Amino acid sequence: MKVRASVKTICRNCKVIRRNGVVRVICKDPRHKQRQG
């Protein structure tokens, strides 16, 4: 899980979602998981 100021999709399987006011990237590649913070 990377914590970044700006989250971007890395591959085409990445999806930007908003969960409890936190912007996240979910992907089937676990290295692409990101959270805004």
Curated annotation (Swiss-Prot):
Keyword match Ribonucleoprotein: yes
Pfam family, one: Ribosomal_L36
UniProt-listed InterPro entries: Ribosomal_bL36, Ribosomal_bL36_sp
Disulfide bond positions: none
Annotated GO MF terms: structural constituent of ribosome
Entry superkingdom: Bacteria
Any one GO cellular component localisation term in the record: ribonucleoprotein complex
Cited SUPFAM superfamilies: Ribosomal protein L36
Keywords, comma-separated and alphabetical: Ribonucleoprotein, Ribosomal protein
Gene Ontology terms describing biological process: translation
Keyword Ribosomal protein: yes
Xref: PROSITE patterns: RIBOSOMAL_L36
Family to which this protein belongs: Belongs to the bacterial ribosomal protein bL36 family.
PANTHER family: 50S RIBOSOMAL PROTEIN L36, CHLOROPLASTIC, LARGE RIBOSOMAL SUBUNIT PROTEIN BL36C
Protein name according to UniProt: Large ribosomal subunit protein bL36
Native species: Thioalkalivibrio sulfidiphilus (strain HL-EbGR7)
